């Protein structure tokens, strides 16, 4: 275990999908910015169904903070109706080196 893992607790990974008015409102840009502020890694992208989906990885407390942001805050012009989280699990190492927007 690295010192980071010990200091911050277990590493977590979670997939998410955000429903509501989340496309055309800079949601991905703000998600990327918030992830960088919190220090989590992963990705975000728009779906054909009008939702935003992605994955977040990092220390459990920071992943939980990002989950809260994805559920309640979002971008200033967005309207979040609901956010679904799935595949939440403990991981031994991060799969990403940063947070990016996928197309």
Swiss-Prot record:
Record-listed S-glutathionyl cysteine modification sites: 26
Catalysed reactions, as listed in the record: an acyl phosphate + H2O = a carboxylate + phosphate + H(+)
Leading EC class: hydrolase
Superkingdom: Eukaryota
Active site: 28, 46
Residues where N-acetylserine is found: 2
Keywords: Acetylation, Disulfide bond, Glutathionylation, Hydrolase
Pfam families: Acylphosphatase (PF00708)
Keyword Acetylation attributed: yes
EC number(s) given by UniProt: 3.6.1.7
Family stated for the protein in its record: Belongs to the acylphosphatase family.
Physiological role: Its physiological role is not yet clear.
The protein's assembly and partners: Monomer (TU1) or homodimer (TU3) in absence of reducing factors; disulfide linked.
Protein name: Acylphosphatase-2
Record gene name: ACYP2
């Amino acid at each position: 275990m690295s010192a980071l893992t010990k200091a911050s607790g277990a590493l977590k990974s979670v997939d998410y999908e955000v429903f509501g008015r989340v496309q055309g409102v800079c949601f991905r840009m703000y998600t990327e910015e918030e992830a960088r502020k919190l220090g989590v890694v992963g990705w975000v992208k728009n779906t054909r169904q009008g939702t935003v989906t992605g994955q977040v990885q990092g220390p459990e407390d920071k992943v939980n903070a990002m989950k809260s942001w994805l559920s309640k805050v979002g971008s200033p012009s967005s309207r979040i109706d609901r956010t679904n989280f799935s595949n939440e699990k403990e991981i031994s190492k991060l799969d990403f080196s940063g947070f990016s927007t996928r197309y």
